Amino acid sequence: MIPKLSRHQLLDIAMSRKDVQPCEECVPLCCPGWISVSGYFDVRKLKFLGTLKAKGAEERWDEYHPNGTNLWSVEAPIAIDHHPYDRSDVRECTHCTRVFLHYTEYGGYYLDERIRALNPKLIV
């Protein structure tokens, strides 16, 4: 069974890894905001820790930006009940344990895997 993580569990994971320095394997992914994963990086190199997806939940597109940020902002809050976090998985680097949020954007003719380094200060 896939573990559904609560806000509290996500915060615990983020706090326990907040001082981890990225290794050579994952340093290209260490962006404070969402980035598209390069086709050269195999996301399966990241260990699955859990998901923020609620099984059977309706797809929602509303985002949470009370301070005028947007999806791509490095200061955008991590609000697990809002898009894209409610469709994200939590993964860690198998070499250094750095933690990331990961989701796949499904466009009409493409798939875009996106990743963001998990910052405990931004979890709301």
Task: Locate the predicted segments by residue.
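Short, compact, well-ordered microdomains
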Residues: 78-124
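Short metal-coordination and nucleic-acid-contact micro-motifs, chiefly zinc-binding Cys/His arrays
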Residues: 16-22, 86-89
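Short recognition patches in nucleic-acid-associated and regulatory proteins
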Residues: 1-8, 18-81
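Short, intrinsically disordered terminal segments enriched in charged and Pro/Gly residues
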Residues: 1-20, 112-124
